[in-house]
């Protein structure tokens, strides 16, 4: 296995363990506390959560990119990365107007909700594009769980 790819897989596994459930619990508790007390300390917490989401999307791109054999698959992987970044930024931006202007919060909340509602449609279309060019592309989870077996299969 390529040494750089092996380090990327190891780093992605460590990030998943660190950033998975603990941050989700912190996010939910912070959100509930913020709604009850109007605490402004939630904005930096949401910044950390959104940076983590964007970094996770970047790690998914770095892990899956070596398996892409067609340029159109790489393009779709980049679209998915940009989509992840937009989701992360919109999650952070949603919380700032809550303290400044409630009307802006409602407007931005509606935009974020529409973006979230169309996520499954976008994912389905991206999967169709990927399978049209390369049907055997492994998923992020398969690569993290399979490790060297997936890499060896890809090299054959």
What is the predicted role of each segment?
Residues 101-123:
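Alpha-helical membrane-embedded segments
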Residues 36-39, 67-74:
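Membrane-interface helix-boundary motifs at transmembrane edges
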Residues 52-60, 75-98, 111-116, 150:
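Hydrophobic alpha-helical membrane segments
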Residues 6-9, 13, 65, 125, ...:
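Residue-level detector of alpha-helical secondary structure
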Residues 51-68, 122-130:
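Membrane-water interface of transmembrane alpha-helices
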Residues 34-41, 97-105:
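Transmembrane helix interruption/hinge and helix-loop junction motifs
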Residues 128-156:
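Short, intrinsically disordered, charge-rich cytosolic tails of integral membrane proteins
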């Amino acid at each position: 296995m390529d040494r750089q790819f092996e380090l990327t897989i190891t780093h992605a596994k460590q990030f998943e363990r660190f950033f998975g459930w603990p941050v989700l619990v912190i996010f939910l508790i912070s959100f509930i506390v913020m709604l009850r007390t109007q605490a402004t300390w939630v904005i930096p917490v949401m910044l950390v959560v959104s940076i983590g989401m964007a970094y996770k999307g970047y790690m998914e791109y770095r892990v899956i990119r070596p398996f892409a054999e067609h340029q159109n698959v790489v393009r779709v992987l980049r679209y998915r990365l940009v989509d992840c970044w937009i989701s992360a930024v919109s999650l952070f931006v949603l919380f700032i107007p809550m303290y400044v202007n409630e009307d802006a919060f409602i407007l931005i909340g509606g935009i974020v909700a529409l973006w979230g509602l169309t996520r499954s449609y976008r994912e389905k279309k991206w999967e169709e594009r990927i399978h049209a060019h390369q049907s055997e592309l492994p998923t992020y989870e398969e690569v993290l769980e399979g490790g060297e077996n997936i890499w060896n299969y890809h090299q054959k």
